[in-house]
Amino acid sequence: MMLEHVLVLSAYLFSIGIYGLITSRNMVRALMCLELILNAVNMNLVTFSDLFDSRQLKGDVFSIFVIAIAAAEAAIGPAIVSSIYRNRKSTRINQSNLLNK
């Protein structure tokens, strides 16, 4: 694929993720939008790593670390959301002020 196509796709995914993160009122939807943002960043890392120096794998290795962090977030995030739901009976972001009680 050409560089411009990958960058446009990555910018589109990043924009959708930011828009969803800003407008989301549900914690699960916010976590999904955060995953979109991380995937867009990974696409940029791999693309620019291949563009600037295809012999070194620094961008690829860094994107693997980002994928590992995203996997940990995908495992821990729903557990935190289900715990909040059990205590508050809601997954809405504006209703879950945990510093209140």
From Swiss-Prot:
Pfam families (alphabetical): Oxidored_q2 (PF00420)
GO cellular component terms listed in the entry, alphabetical order: chloroplast thylakoid membrane; NADH dehydrogenase complex
Compartment list: Plastid, Chloroplast thylakoid membrane
Keyword field contains NAD: yes
Catalysis: reaction(s): a plastoquinone + NADH + (n+1) H(+)(in) = a plastoquinol + NAD(+) + n H(+)(out); a plastoquinone + NADPH + (n+1) H(+)(in) = a plastoquinol + NADP(+) + n H(+)(out)
Protein's membrane topology: Multi-pass membrane protein
Top-level taxon of the source organism: Eukaryota
GO molecular function, one term: quinone binding
EC number: 7.1.1.-
Keyword entries, A-Z: Chloroplast, Membrane, NAD, NADP, Plastid, Plastoquinone, Quinone, Thylakoid, Translocase, Transmembrane, Transmembrane helix, Transport
Top class in the EC scheme: translocase
GO biological processes: ATP synthesis coupled electron transport; photosynthesis, light reaction
Family: Belongs to the complex I subunit 4L family.
Functional note: NDH shuttles electrons from NAD(P)H:plastoquinone, via FMN and iron-sulfur (Fe-S) centers, to quinones in the photosynthetic chain and possibly in a chloroplast respiratory chain. The immediate electron acceptor for the enzyme in this species is believed to be plastoquinone. Couples the redox reaction to proton translocation, and thus conserves the redox energy in a proton gradient.
HAMAP family the record matches: NDH1_NuoK (MF_01456)
Assembly and binders: NDH is composed of at least 16 different subunits, 5 of which are encoded in the nucleus.
Name under which the protein is recorded: NAD(P)H-quinone oxidoreductase subunit 4L, chloroplastic
Organism of this sequence: Nuphar advena
Lineage: Eukaryota, Viridiplantae, Streptophyta, Embryophyta, Tracheophyta
